[in-house]
UniProtKB/Swiss-Prot annotation:
A family per Pfam: Ribosomal_S17
Family from the record: Belongs to the universal ribosomal protein uS17 family.
Name by which UniProt lists this protein: Small ribosomal subunit protein uS17
Assembly and interaction partners: Part of the 30S ribosomal subunit.
GO cellular component: cytosolic small ribosomal subunit
HAMAP family with a match to the protein in the record: Ribosomal_uS17_B (MF_01345_B)
UniProt source species: Streptomyces griseus subsp. griseus (strain JCM 4626 / CBS 651.72 / NBRC 13350 / KCC S-0626 / ISP 5235)
Superkingdom of origin: Bacteria
Name of encoding gene: rpsQ
UniProt-listed InterPro entries: NA-bd_OB-fold (IPR012340), Ribosomal_uS17 (IPR000266), Ribosomal_uS17_bact/chlr (IPR019984), Ribosomal_uS17_CS (IPR019979)
């Protein structure tokens, strides 16, 4: 029975997307812009193309700086364009 209650509490929160990216701007208060790279294969020619999305992520402690590699997770809308938050800083900029 205890195992069943544990699985139920895990499913309450639901699945959230995570992405890894590079911080390209930290000029806003408690917000960073993260560039997330995605590699896709061209449908007709087969060449691998790099596509980059820039996402605004919430940084509560203002700890991330430009050049840091971070892990971000999807969250509820925090502003008009901010729907991600920083989970951890994987690598600090050199």
């Amino acid at each position: 029975m205890s195992e069943k209650t544990v699985t139920e509490t895990n499913t309450d929160r639901g699945f959230r997307k995570t992405r890894e990216g590079l911080v390209v701007s930290d000029k806003m208060d408690k917000t960073v812009v993260v560039a997330v790279e995605d590699r896709v294969k061209h449908a007709l020619y087969g060449k691998v193309i790099r596509r980059t999305n820039k996402l605004k992520a919430h940084d509560e402690q203002n700890s991330a700086g430009v050049g840091d590699r971070v892990l971000i997770m999807e969250t509820r809308p925090l502003s008009a364009s901010k729907r991600w938050r920083i989970v951890e800083i994987l690598e600090k900029a050199k």
